[in-house]
């Protein structure tokens, strides 16, 4: 969607997001960022809204895009991504590959390993944003997003 101003354009963006049907289940954040860099010629503020779970490295694409545009990363995630609930056997499915498996969430060792993976992943993600000079915010789906966004925008001013 090309950048424009006005209420009508905002409603179009919302409609496009609601009606969007992905052509593929796989994620390639780097490809989306490269498209932004090539397609939008004039400098703009681009909001990158994602869970940022991607097997591919997109740091270079993000750095290049942020030199040309003002990129703001907004990570949205469910709290259970950070801390698995203790509910016994849980069937999990990789949304991209369709691979399913059962994990025993009653095991403290399993929950700790997952939590450690999440913390490491978040540290790597923050490192990517810092080295790319991209402002970012992480928002849980069960949190009030307004205060998080207000803090981000206050920091940017």
Where are the predicted features?
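Von Willebrand factor type A / integrin I
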Residues: 38-42, 54, 60-157
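Acidic beta-strand-to-loop metal/phosphate-binding motif
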Residues: 45-51
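Von Willebrand factor
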Residues: 9-44, 56, 78
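Charge-dense, low-complexity intrinsically disordered segments
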Residues: 4, 19, 23, 112, ...
């Amino acid at each position: 969607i090309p950048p424009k101003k006005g209420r009508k354009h905002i409603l179009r963006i919302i409609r496009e997001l609601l009606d969007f049907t992905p052509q593929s289940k796989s994620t390639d954040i780097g490809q989306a960022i490269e498209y932004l860099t090539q397609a939008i010629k004039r400098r703009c503020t681009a909001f990158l809204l994602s869970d940022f779970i991607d097997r591919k490295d997109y740091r270079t694409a993000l750095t290049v895009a942020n030199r040309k545009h003002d990129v703001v990363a907004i990570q949205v995630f469910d709290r259970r991504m950070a801390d698995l609930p203790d509910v016994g056997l849980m069937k999990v499915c990789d949304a991209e590959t369709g691979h399913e498996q059962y994990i025993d969430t009653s095991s403290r060792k399993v929950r700790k390993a997952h939590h450690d993976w999440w913390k490491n992943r978040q540290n790597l993600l923050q490192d990517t944003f810092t080295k790319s000079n991209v402002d970012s915010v992480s928002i849980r789906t069960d949190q009030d997003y307004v205060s998080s966004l207000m803090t981000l925008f206050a920091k940017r001013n």
